[in-house]
From Swiss-Prot:
A molecular-function term among this protein's GO annotations: DNA-directed RNA polymerase activity
Record field: catalytic activity: RNA(n) + a ribonucleoside 5'-triphosphate = RNA(n+1) + diphosphate
UniProt entry keywords in alphabetical sequence: DNA-directed RNA polymerase, Nucleotidyltransferase, Transcription, Transferase
Pfam families for the chain: RNA_pol_Rpb6
Subunit structure: The RNAP catalytic core consists of 2 alpha, 1 beta, 1 beta' and 1 omega subunit. When a sigma factor is associated with the core the holoenzyme is formed, which can initiate transcription.
Sequence similarity: Belongs to the RNA polymerase subunit omega family.
Protein name, as recorded: DNA-directed RNA polymerase subunit omega
Organism from which the protein derives: Bartonella bacilliformis (strain ATCC 35685 / KC583 / Herrer 020/F12,63)
């Protein structure tokens, strides 16, 4: 192939935009040292990537899966759900109820809006330094 265009590859990948994404991803792989599957013929990496797709030496589905995997930052792993155990003894139930009653009796200090404003007014602004 003398020149590879998008038209040569459109029958392999239906969407032109997806084709460009896949070819760009493959070109980045080649620049990072991946083995090429066609002869280079003094072509640049994007042209080599398009030639690989046109010659079907690479599967577009595999390239798409690899592109998706490379873009993911957080991969969700299906973990089995924890099995809930039911309490069968009444003494255990009473101890659980006692701890919940203790939590209800806890009190927190609340600040009124006036106290908050008074505290903000009392703050001292730090001196400006030339470190910025």
């Amino acid at each position: 192939m003398a020149r590879v265009t998008v038209e040569d590859c459109i029958d392999k990948v239906d969407n032109r935009f997806e084709l460009v994404l896949l070819a760009g991803h493959r070109a980045r792989q080649i620049s990072q040292g991946a083995q090429i599957t066609v002869s280079r013929d003094n072509d640049k990496n994007p042209v080599v990537a398009l030639r690989e797709i046109a010659d079907e030496t690479l599967s577009p589905a595999d390239l798409k899966e690899d592109l998706i995997h490379s873009l993911q930052k957080h991969v969700e792993v299906d973990e089995p759900e924890a099995v809930t155990e039911f309490i069968s003894h009444s003494s255990e139930t009473e101890s659980v109820l006692d701890t919940s009653r203790e939590e209800e009796n806890c009190s927190f200090d609340y600040m009124s809006e006036e106290d908050l404003l008074a505290g903000i007014e009392g703050l001292v602004v730090p001196e400006k330094s030339d470190d910025y």
